[in-house]
């Protein structure tokens, strides 16, 4: 790195930090912290334990954001001053040190940028994820199972917990349908970037002629909502079906109709759960999924209205990413317009950078 490149990098990082400050609004957050301190000083604050806990969580999140921003601000301010002095005094040793530390500074600003991108109220929620293979039988069902494994590995890498809600194995290979919850801080904030159609191009292992096949799978992600958000579901708007839960190869898990499928008639949203032997528990989980899907549905309508576009009724959404294994290897995301060559690592769950690039690109746009 030379003096010109470093100077341009500093300009970019200062611009990024100013944008972060504009989005984060530290003054407003500090004002809210003062309000919380006053509330905590009240004698009857702990009489309402639920509210006190909620405020405590809010306080910790605000402190986390401010600490991260202040660290980045202090670091960049100090670097600006040091660079100005070193340049004026032609201190090559100090300049060389700054060049060497450029990557660390860049990563610090990017980390701060990401934390701001995940500042929406729902971002900290758990993520309810459903994967549905497209047309194409075994080939698409196998692709759905590859995506499922990719997300399980990503959750494992981030020390997130996974709760399986529904799993329907494919007839020959792969899966017909899977729904699960990824539990952890900002799980939804990250996983919302996976909402959409995922396209795979490869030489099919199920084709004796070894021809190249294109497969599609839909990934639907919604935040797990708590009881504070009231989603009204009227009986007349839903149809509930029960059926026997089955395992891989059509093996019955039990002989009672414990599996639940709920159809929300006005929107066409369908959820199902068969993971538990108890029909009652499956029904509770299915309603949880439905409420989250309806909440996400309304959010999407609001976003579409704000952007001046009509919300698509197509549950398949839009193609967001292509995974090409043949004739070359590349994963390319259409939103960030960035291609990645580490295909094997990505399919093994190394998707955090790819998601962060999407978050930055979509927020910048």
UniProtKB/Swiss-Prot annotation:
Gene3D superfamilies, per database record: 3.30.160.20, 3.30.70.1660, Release factor
Positions of modified residues (N5-methylglutamine): 251
GO MF terms held by the record: translation release factor activity, codon specific
Entry-linked Pfam families: PCRF (PF03462), RF-1 (PF00472)
PANTHER family reported for this sequence: CLASS I PEPTIDE CHAIN RELEASE FACTOR, PEPTIDE CHAIN RELEASE FACTOR 2
Function: Peptide chain release factor 2 directs the termination of translation in response to the peptide chain termination codons UGA and UAA.
Stated name of the protein: Peptide chain release factor 2
Organismal lineage: Bacteria, Pseudomonadati, Campylobacterota, Epsilonproteobacteria, Campylobacterales
Designated gene of the protein: prfB
């Amino acid at each position: 790195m030379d003096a010109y490149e470093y100077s341009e990098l500093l300009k970019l990082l200062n611009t990024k930090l100013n944008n972060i400050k504009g989005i984060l609004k530290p003054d407003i957050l500090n004002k809210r912290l003062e309000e919380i301190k006053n509330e905590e000083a009240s004698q009857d604050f702990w009489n309402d334990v639920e509210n006190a806990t909620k405020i405590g969580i809010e306080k910790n999140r605000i402190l986390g954001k401010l600490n991260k921003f202040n660290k980045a601000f202090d670091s960049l301010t100090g670097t600006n001053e040091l660079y100005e002095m070193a340049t004026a005094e032609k201190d090559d040793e100090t300049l060389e040190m700054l060049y060497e530390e450029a990557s660390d500074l860049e990563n610090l600003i990017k980390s701060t940028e990401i934390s701001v991108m995940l500042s929406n109220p729902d971002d900290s929620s758990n993520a309810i994820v459903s994967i549905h293979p497209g047309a194409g039988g075994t080939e698409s069902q196998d692709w759905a199972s590859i995506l499922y494994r990719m997300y399980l590995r990503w959750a494992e890498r981030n020390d997130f917990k996974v709760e399986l809600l529904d799993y329907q194995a494919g007839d020959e290979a792969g899966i017909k349908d899977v729904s699960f919850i990824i539990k952890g801080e900002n799980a939804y904030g990250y996983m919302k970037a996976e909402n959409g159609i995922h396209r795979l191009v490869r030489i099919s292992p199920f084709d004796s002629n070894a021809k190249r096949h294109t497969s599609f799978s839909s990934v639907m992600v919604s935040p797990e909502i708590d009881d504070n958000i009231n989603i009204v579901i009227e009986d007349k708007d839903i149809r509930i079906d029960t059926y026997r839960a089955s395992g891989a190869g059509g093996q019955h898990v039990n002989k009672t109709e414990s599996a639940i499928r709920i159809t929300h008639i006005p929107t066409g949203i369908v959820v199902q759960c068969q993971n538990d032997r108890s029909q009652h528990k499956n029904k509770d989980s299915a309603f949880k999924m439905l409420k989250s899907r309806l909440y996400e549905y309304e959010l999407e309508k609001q976003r579409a209205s704000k952007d001046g576009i009509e919300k698509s009724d197509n549950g398949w959404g839009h193609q967001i990413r292509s995974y090409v294994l043949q004739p070359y290897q590349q994963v390319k995301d259409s939103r960030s317009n960035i291609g990645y060559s580490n295909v094997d690592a990505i399919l093994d769950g190394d998707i955090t950078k790819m998601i962060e690039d999407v978050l930055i690109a979509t927020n910048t746009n």
